[in-house]
Amino acid sequence: MTVLRGAFTGWVDVLRAGIDTNMNDPDPNARIYKGENGNGRFFVDYCNWDRIAEYKNFIFNSNAAHIGAALMNSQNVQLFHEHVLVKEASTDVPTPWHQDAPYYCVTGPKTVSLWVPLDTIERDTTLEFVSGSHLWGKHFRPQRFDGSALNEDDGLEEIPDINQHRDEYEILGWAVEPGDAIAFDYRTIHGAAGNHQPNRQRRAFSLRLVGDGARFVRRDGLVSSPPFPNLTLKSGDPLTGDTFPFLLHA
């Protein structure tokens, strides 16, 4: 993973406006998590790029695809989905440690998430990563952000208790400013603390991209997230169709 300073500074206001629209008109799949004492709100939504003009503008007209191509060393770049995560002020809900790959109906050797903060985020509340975890050769059981398992009997092992054994891992994280980006592989274990700031949101727009060799994976009997319920692709098919548009095509 790497931090890209100022990569999208010129798009901050656009994405903030898009998130305002999104939060006022969420998708049915949106989730809102409350803290233990009912304090704050953690808003999570995805797959709205085709109905929110600001998201679509950023995805197709920023340099995100070119950044993704360089990071993945890929000639082709496709959109997998966008993901919005907003922790309102004084929201004590953490983002649990997880990998993105086990949630997904896609597989491939070239993947990257571009996590773009839209507020100043200090080191103690930023997204953190377990360095090298994308090379462990393991997928861990995906869980919802309230800690419940996405699938109870998926055959995957539970993710290690990172918080109880932080000294056993190399954990990376950066204080970031609006318009910076943190790039990471779908297999990388990551998580974040709650937002303890009393007067500031923690808004982030995450763009999930795939490169050469991306294939659809149907996990029969298991829930994937996002669900993409209307797809007719078969397992092993290349990603095709309007759901996964090419942003760069060789």
Region locations from a protein language model:
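Non-heme Fe(II)/2-oxoglutarate
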Residues: 28-29, 34, 140-145, 178-183, ...
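Glycine-rich phosphate/pyrophosphate-binding beta-alpha loops
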Residues: 100-102, 111, 191-196
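Short, solvent-exposed loop/turn segments at secondary-structure junctions
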Residues: 8-10, 85-86, 102, 120-121, ...
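Non-heme Fe(II)-dependent double-stranded beta-helix
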Residues: 2-97, 103-104, 142, 229-231, ...
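Double-stranded beta-helix
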Residues: 122-189
